């Protein structure tokens, strides 16, 4: 098996290096990742400037682009040979609920899915036990073979920031959701000009049993199938009925 690994925290982040080291025990691995932190880049592609991949001594690559750029580049003729699986992570911090909208970690996996490959996104609910998340991924890859064959979904994994031995197990979950975003942070820079920072993530609003928030909070690894199709199917009929009524008045 040959695995393409990417992330949004950047090539030099601890999470991706720990992940690649562990994956290399079970497969051939090549990293193509951003050359800097590109957190919350979502699925953006770089269209107004060229991508410049830099070949590193160990055979991996870092790129002056987004996570989606890296996977798009790697799988569209840049890499030679077959790739069997895309794994994105390990993200420093969870990607649960509404986080998935902004996440560059998920975007890299979704780009792999878009290009026809099975894909996994993995995040750690903290910044300490990356080795736990890496072991989880290596443990799950053989077990997820059937599910990974679905070309229209990715698997989103969130891991509690605990030693591996303290994990309670695995739960398949739906996404929870957070409350409205907190206000931006207003400051003055050294030139006395007003600047703004995007604030931290809002607190979970739906962390009921069955959600990813609930699982991770209670010591379980959450496993959530994610699809790129954003259609609200439950609203199609009611919207069509409304439209029909409006045009028959």
UniProtKB/Swiss-Prot annotation:
<feature type="binding site">
    <location>
        <position position="91"/>
    </location>
    <ligand>
        <name>a divalent metal cation</name>
    </ligand>
</feature>
<dbReference type="InterPro" id="IPR002828">
    <property type="entry name" value="SurE-like_Pase/nucleotidase"/>
</dbReference>
<comment type="similarity">
    <text>Belongs to the SurE nucleotidase family.</text>
</comment>
<dbReference type="GO" id="GO:0008254">
    <property type="term" value="F:3'-nucleotidase activity"/>
</dbReference>
<dbReference type="GO" id="GO:0000166">
    <property type="term" value="F:nucleotide binding"/>
</dbReference>
<dbReference type="GO" id="GO:0046872">
    <property type="term" value="F:metal ion binding"/>
</dbReference>
<keyword id="KW-0479">Metal-binding</keyword>
<dbReference type="GO" id="GO:0005737">
    <property type="term" value="C:cytoplasm"/>
</dbReference>
<comment type="function">
    <text>Nucleotidase that shows phosphatase activity on nucleoside 5'-monophosphates.</text>
</comment>
<keyword id="KW-0378">Hydrolase</keyword>
<dbReference type="GO" id="GO:0008253">
    <property type="term" value="F:5'-nucleotidase activity"/>
</dbReference>
<dbReference type="InterPro" id="IPR030048">
    <property type="entry name" value="SurE"/>
</dbReference>
<feature type="binding site">
    <location>
        <position position="39"/>
    </location>
    <ligand>
        <name>a divalent metal cation</name>
    </ligand>
</feature>
<keyword id="KW-0547">Nucleotide-binding</keyword>
<dbReference type="GO" id="GO:0004309">
    <property type="term" value="F:exopolyphosphatase activity"/>
</dbReference>
<protein>
    <recommendedName>
        <fullName>5'-nucleotidase SurE</fullName>
        <ecNumber>3.1.3.5</ecNumber>
    </recommendedName>
</protein>
<dbReference type="InterPro" id="IPR036523">
    <property type="entry name" value="SurE-like_sf"/>
</dbReference>
<dbReference type="Pfam" id="PF01975">
    <property type="entry name" value="SurE"/>
</dbReference>
<feature type="binding site">
    <location>
        <position position="8"/>
    </location>
    <ligand>
        <name>a divalent metal cation</name>
    </ligand>
</feature>
<feature type="binding site">
    <location>
        <position position="9"/>
    </location>
    <ligand>
        <name>a divalent metal cation</name>
    </ligand>
</feature>
<keyword id="KW-0963">Cytoplasm</keyword>
């Amino acid at each position: 098996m040959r695995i393409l690994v990417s992330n949004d925290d950047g090539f030099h982040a601890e999470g991706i290096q720990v992940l690649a080291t562990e994956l290399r025990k079970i497969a051939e691995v090549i990293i193509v990742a951003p050359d800097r932190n590109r957190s919350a880049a979502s699925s953006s592609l770089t269209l107004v400037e060229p991508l410049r991949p830099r070949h590193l001594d160990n055979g991996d690559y870092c790129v002056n682009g987004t996570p989606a750029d890296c996977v798009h580049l790697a799988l569209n003729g840049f890499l030679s040979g077959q790739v069997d699986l895309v794994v994105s992570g390990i993200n420093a911090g969870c990607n649960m609920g509404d986080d998935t909208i902004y996440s560059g970690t998920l975007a890299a996996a979704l780009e792999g899915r878009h290009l026809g490959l099975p894909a996994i996104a993995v995040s750690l609910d903290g910044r300490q036990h990356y080795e736990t998340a890496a072991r989880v991924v290596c443990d799950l890859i053989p077990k997820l073979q059937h599910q990974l064959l679905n070309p229209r979904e990715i698997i989103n994994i969130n891991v509690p920031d605990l030693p591996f031995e303290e994990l309670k197990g695995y739960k398949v979950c739906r996404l929870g959701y957070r409350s409205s975003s907190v206000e931006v942070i207003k400051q003055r820079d050294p030139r006395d000009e007003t600047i703004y920072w995007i604030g931290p993530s809002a607190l979970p609003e739906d962390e009921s049993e069955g959600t990813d928030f609930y699982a991770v909070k209670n010591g379980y690894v959450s496993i959530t199938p994610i699809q790129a199709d954003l259609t609200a199917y439950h609203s199609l009929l009611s919207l069509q009925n409304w439209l029909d009524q409006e045009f028959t008045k």
